[in-house]
Design a protein with these regions (language model features):
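Active-site C-terminal subdomain of aminotransferase-like
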Residues: 1-46, 52
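Non-transmembrane alpha-helical segments in soluble domains
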Residues: 28-31, 55, 159, 163
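A general structural signal marking secondary-structure boundaries and capping sites
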Residues: 38, 62, 166-169
Length: 171
């Protein structure tokens, strides 16, 4: 090798002949956790069960609307003044496919309200209870029960806290 470094251009320049010891050590720990959990098969089964259970709990919410009712509400940004009172109450539906083979473990909740800030308020309310969700603007919150460490109780708490937050925001 010459004494001067001459990098290879492009993505090939990022190749390594030996991985970092720290990177491999953290990978080993992660693989050991997956091995203890039974690897991918049992984790996927548990993921399907947890996600289905969370979906069932969310569908029991007083603020949940069916796919049919959600379709009637969709042009929300064009709500007329006569429709305003009908859509004042916060509501949500699940837009993730119901078939477990057509989705991962995440459920996307689409929120309906005349309040443009509803999704942000709900997300902040959930965070105050320790429920971590992911936001997609303008009005979707994604909740994901993770098979490695979430429990049935976590799903029950998440659904309960969502109900409490929406109740607090209901005018």
């Amino acid at each position: 090798m010459p004494p001067d470094f001459s990098p290879i251009r492009g993505a090939q320049g990022l190749q390594l002949s030996n991985p970092s010891v720290l990177g491999v050590a953290s990978l080993l720990g992660s693989l050991q956790v997956f091995q203890e959990a039974g690897m991918v098969g049992p984790l996927r089964t548990r993921s399907i069960e947890l996600t289905a259970y969370l979906g069932k709990l969310l569908a029991q919410s007083a603020y949940f609307v069916s796919a049919h009712e959600a379709a009637m509400r969709l042009p929300l940004c064009a709500v007329s003044s006569t429709d305003h009172d009908q859509h004042r109450r916060p509501a949500f539906t699940i837009i993730t496919p119901s078939d477990a083979n057509s989705r991962g473990s995440q459920l996307s909740l689409l929120f309906f309200s005349s309040d443009a800030e509803l999704m942000h308020k709900v997300l902040e309310g959930l965070r105050s209870y320790g429920v971590i969700g992911d936001e997609r603007h303008p009005n979707v919150i994604r909740l994901t029960p993770t098979a490695l460490y979430n429990t049935v109780q976590d799903c029950e708490n998440g659904a309960k806290y969502l109900e409490e937050v929406l109740k607090e925001l209901d005018i």
